[in-house]
Structures are given as C-alpha cells and as structure tokens.
C-alpha cells in the first residue's frame, strides 16, 4: 500500500515538475522574443536618429546645390551621392540614381525615405513597414526640439507633410486632425499606430 502511495506521489511530483518546466519554457521563449523585438526596435530608432542627423546637416547644402529644389525624391539621390546614408541601408551595387523614388532598406524590411518639402518643414524622414511596437516606441521617443535638433513634429500615416499644415512653435504630434505635444503619450501612440500602415514621418526644419 505504501509502495503504491509512493509511486502515485512520485508520478504526481513528476507531472508537477514537468508542468513547471513547461511554464518556464513558455515564459523563457516569451522573454527572448520580447528582448529580440526590443533590440530590433532600438536598432531602427538608432538608425533613424543617425539618418536624421545627416539630413539636417545636408538639407542646406541640398538647397544650395539644387536651385529651385521642389522634387522631394531628388534628395534621396543627393544624400546617396554625398555618402550621407549608412552603408547598411544601401543595396549592394545599386546606383544612387535608383534612390530617386525607392526608399533605403534596413533590417526587418523597415524602409527609410527622405522627402524635401521646403517651407516650415524643410525635410521629412519617412520610416515605413514598422510593427506596432516599433511605431509606438518611435513616436514616444524624444527627438528634440526646433531649437536643439531642428525636430518640429511627428505624424503617422501616408500624409508626409501633416506637420507642415499646422501653425506651431514647438514640436508637435499630429494624429488625424488633432495636434498633441511631442513626443506622443502612450495612449495617443496606441491610437495612432496600427491603423495607418505604421508609416512614421519625422519632420525637421
């Protein structure tokens, strides 16, 4: 009788151990996935930050070298020729002229496209094919102010010059027809990301 009890208890204990291992395995995989996603997201944000630094430094040169500049697509080619684009975003062997309308491609198929607009917003960096998490982290990141980094606003969606239409003196976030302070709050970001193809537009003067 005691032996049967011991065998039964041993089996129950073994099942308990297996259940714990299963829970830990699922939790471990979940943690690894979150860490990988966070790492990838940080890489995308770092790349966008480096790109933005190059853009804001080059936009005045672009205006001087391209009199009457109005076609935003031409700035992609200009940045490529000036070697102001990270090598990791360039397709091997592609000519700079190929970047007139084609965005630069990074990790996880995230793409970067530069649009020269002129006016209050001189240039916009479009970052597309973002996951919801990437989008939310990007729009809640502090990209600076008009006086420090030249950053004047962020929007999500296809309308590249949404920020250009508002009368603002400080960095703003545009969601639909509403203007919010930048960076976006988490609630605003959750509303913006996931419903507009997750294209983030970072606008600089």
Report the location of each language-model feature:
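Short, glycine/small-hydrophobic-rich surface segments
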Residues: 58-93
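Short, exposed beta-strand "edge-strand" segments with a Pro/Gly-rich flavor and a Y/T-containing core
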Residues: 8, 62-69, 124-129, 178-179
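N-terminal single-pass transmembrane signal-anchor helix
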Residues: 1-47
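Glycine-centered flexibility motif
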Residues: 16, 63, 83, 100-109
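Intrinsically disordered, low-complexity regions enriched in Pro/Ser/Thr/Gly and acidic residues
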Residues: 91-205
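Membrane-proximal N-terminal amphipathic helix
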Residues: 30-67, 71
